[in-house]
């Protein structure tokens, strides 16, 4: 059953509801009091707004298991639409991963550190990222961006690599690009006046040896 709350501000004095199965987001334009007969948790407020010195959208896309040393030689042939898009930007051909393994590579993307400095090198050896190390998403949030990871697995929730994101949607197994793209469109439509820093981790190219047992999250 949803939890009833009461919302009070200078312009609103009415009951409301909390969905107990998912985080609830309320957009506030003025000082607002929330009250309820039952306990509820309040997260860190998300700053929303545009500044001319910020980009409207910074979109960080990680296509897991897409090897450039293979795709690079036939990029325009195999991925024509992607090739046309990046023809107007920069392609770094001398960019190398710190590991042929996703877990430590994600930590490097977020921190800029080698695994022997971040201590993130194996998901079966739990190490929390030092609080003295600022992540890429924390820098973005400190500079006024609304930060979100709308598709990606949740390992970074426990080791601290994803601690700078205001909103996270974790999918540990199935993460198709079409579903993540829809989430991004809905997210941008919901906050058109914000400056966004969005991380999008898709695994369409990643080989899976196990059967696809997971239901689509959109269902």
Give the ranges of each region predicted by the language model.
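Catalytic domains that recognize anionic headgroups
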Residues: 1-219
């Amino acid at each position: 059953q949803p939890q009833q709350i009461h919302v009070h501000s200078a312009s609103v004095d009415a009951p409301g509801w909390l969905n107990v199965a998912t985080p609830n987001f309320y957009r506030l334009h003025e000082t607002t009091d929330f009250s309820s007969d039952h306990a509820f948790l309040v997260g860190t407020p998300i700053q929303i707004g545009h500044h001319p010195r910020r980009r409207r959208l910074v979109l960080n896309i990680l296509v897991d298991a897409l090897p450039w040393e293979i795709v690079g030689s036939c990029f325009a042939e195999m991925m024509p639409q992607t090739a046309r898009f990046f023809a107007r930007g920069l392609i770094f051909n001398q960019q190398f991963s710190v590991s042929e393994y996703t877990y430590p590579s994600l930590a490097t993307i977020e921190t800029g550190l080698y695994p022997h400095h971040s201590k993130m090198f194996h998901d079966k050896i739990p190490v929390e990222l030092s609080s003295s190390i600022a992540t890429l998403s924390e820098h973005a949030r400190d500079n006024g961006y609304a930060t979100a990871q709308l598709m990606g697995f949740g390992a970074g929730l426990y080791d601290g690599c994803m601690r700078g994101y205001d909103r996270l949607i974790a999918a540990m197994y199935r993460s198709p690009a079409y579903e993540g793209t829809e989430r991004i469109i809905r997210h941008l439509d919901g906050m058109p006046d914000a400056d966004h820093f969005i991380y999008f981790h898709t695994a369409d190219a990643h080989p899976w040896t196990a059967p696809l047992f997971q239901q689509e999250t959109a269902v």
